[in-house]
UniProtKB/Swiss-Prot annotation:
Protein family membership: Belongs to the short-chain dehydrogenases/reductases (SDR) family.
EC code(s) of this entry: 1.1.1.-, 1.1.1.391
Active-site residues, Swiss-Prot/TrEMBL: Y158
Swiss-Prot/TrEMBL catalytic activity: 3-oxo-5beta-cholan-24-oate + NADH + H(+) = isolithocholate + NAD(+); 12alpha-hydroxy-3-oxo-5beta-cholan-24-oate + NADH + H(+) = isodeoxycholate + NAD(+); 7alpha,12alpha-dihydroxy-3-oxo-5beta-cholan-24-oate + NADH + H(+) = isocholate + NAD(+); 3-oxochenodeoxycholate + NADH + H(+) = isochenodeoxycholate + NAD(+)
GO biological process, one term: steroid metabolic process
Molecular function via GO: oxidoreductase activity
SUPFAM superfamilies named among the record's database cross-references: NAD(P)-binding Rossmann-fold domains
Superkingdom of the organism of origin: Bacteria
Stated role: Involved in the modification of secondary bile acids into iso-bile acids (3beta-bile acids) via epimerization of the 3-OH group through a 3-oxo-intermediate. Catalyzes the reduction of 12-alpha-hydroxy-3-oxo-5-beta-cholan-24-oate (3-oxo-DCA) and 3-oxo-5-beta-cholan-24-oate (3-oxo-LCA) to yield isodeoxycholate (isoDCA) and isolithocholate (isoLCA), respectively.
Keyword annotations from UniProtKB, A to Z: Lipid metabolism, NAD, Oxidoreductase, Steroid metabolism
Binding site for NAD(+): D65, V66, N92, Y158, K162
Protein name according to UniProt: 3beta-hydroxysteroid dehydrogenase 1
Length: 261
């Protein structure tokens, strides 16, 4: 637990399920005011809010499509209305669509980039403007992926968007470090989330994934939530411009683990 987080306000985009819901719940457990954003899964976001409130925290569910700048502005305004300010902004919302690159439509490509990269920039931009206007320190956490550095066939748009998130994070961190604004990213590996539920229900598919992970098992959303809480806290006050890989070692070239390769 991080005492310095208590009473602060955090916005978490894409909080209906998976990593976003886990981070929102962890922030609530830290005593924070949580704005749980969703695009279409209202019930999921309200379940996140209920869990936070039942644990004694304060939270609000707010609809917004982060690929649209005006919706990001409205999300910020809702956070201001609900809790009077924003201290931490977490850009978690993201999508992925599998298709061979030679058959991937420009519209499909653009949709992924709009949500995963442009939406992240829009959130960063709005949060930074608020921090500067109030002359206050602030924290931004962007959700990247191991595919920030690992190529992913059939997901060229997703991999490109996450590589972009990594460099955007570094650039903004450098640009605003002297203003007390910290910008970091978290890059999850294989996680037990709803988006992976069907795949991991197949024992062979799960085992194949686990062979790519030096630690030998798939991670939990709570692993990412723990990383987010630390990055948001004063314990990470000297950390900015980094991507924290929460991946069980997946990015460590696992084929070389036992002298192979």
């Amino acid at each position: 637990m991080y005492d310095d987080l208590k009473g602060k306000t955090v916005v978490v985009t894409g909080s209906s399920k998976g990593l976003g819901a886990a981070m929102a719940r962890r922030f609530g457990a830290e005593g924070m005011n949580v704005v749980a954003n969703y695009r279409s899964d209202e019930e999921g976001a309200r379940e996140t809010v209920r869990a936070i409130e039942e644990a004694g925290g304060a939270a609000a569910a707010v609809q917004a499509d982060v690929s649209k700048n005006e919706c990001v502005d409205a999300l910020f305004d809702a956070a201001m209305f609900s809790f009077g300010g924003v201290d931490i902004w977490v850009n978690n919302a993201g999508i992925e669509v599998a298709s061979p690159s030679d058959r991937k439509s420009i519209e499909e490509w653009q949709r992924v980039i709009d949500v995963n990269l442009t939406g992240v920039f829009a959130g960063c931009r709005r949060a930074i403007d608020h921090f500067l206007d109030r002359k206050m320190p602030g924290v931004i956490i962007n959700l990247s992926s191991v595919h920030e550095i690992i190529p992913w066939p059939h997901f060229a748009d997703y991999a490109a968007s996450k590589a972009g998130v990594g460099m955007l994070t570094k650039t903004l961190a450098l640009e605003y470090a002297d203003r007390g604004i910290r910008v970091n990213a978290i890059a999850p590996g294989a996680m037990n989330t709803p988006i992976n539920a069907e795949k991991f229900a197949d024992p062979e598919a799960r085992a194949a994934t686990e062979r790519l992970i030096p630690m030998g098992y798939v991670g939990a959303p709570e692993d990412v939530a723990a990383a987010a809480a630390w990055l948001a806290s004063d314990q990470a006050s000297y950390v900015t411009g980094t991507t924290l890989f929460v991946d069980g070692g997946m990015t460590l070239y696992p084929g070389f683990q036992f002298g192979q390769g």
